[in-house]
């Protein structure tokens, strides 16, 4: 009976270890894919020079408004939101 308990405990520990390792691998792979597409969307934004276009659009506003928006960092916030939307589009296009 003692041998069966030891074998049972060994199997339980082995399956527990396997499930934990598979879960960690799954999470790491998801993080890798998200980082890859985040960097890819950043390259696309740089390639099409979208960030300077956002700055130019804000510069076209009256100085009191554009200064306030730059102070709040709205240009950077719009760039981050745009990059997040592009990342989401790429992930959905590949069903990830």
UniProtKB/Swiss-Prot annotation:
An MF annotation (GO) of this entry: toxin activity
Keyword line: Enterotoxin, Host cell membrane, Host membrane, Membrane, Secreted, Toxin, Transmembrane, Transmembrane helix, Virulence
Protein origin, superkingdom: Bacteria
Entry's transmembrane regions: 76-96
Statement: the UniProt record of this protein carries the keyword Transmembrane: yes
InterPro entries: DUF2523 (IPR019670)
Subcellular location: Secreted; Host cell membrane
Protein name: Accessory cholera enterotoxin
């Amino acid at each position: 009976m003692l041998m069966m308990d030891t074998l049972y405990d060994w199997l339980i520990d082995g399956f527990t270890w396997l499930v934990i390792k598979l879960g960690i691998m799954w999470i790491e792979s998801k993080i890798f894919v998200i980082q890859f597409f985040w960097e890819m969307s950043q390259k696309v934004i740089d390639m099409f020079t979208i960030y300077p276009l956002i700055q130019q659009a804000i510069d076209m506003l009256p100085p009191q408004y554009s200064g306030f928006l730059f102070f709040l960092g709205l240009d950077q916030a719009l760039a981050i939101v745009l990059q997040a939307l592009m990342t989401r589009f790429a992930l959905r296009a590949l069903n990830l």
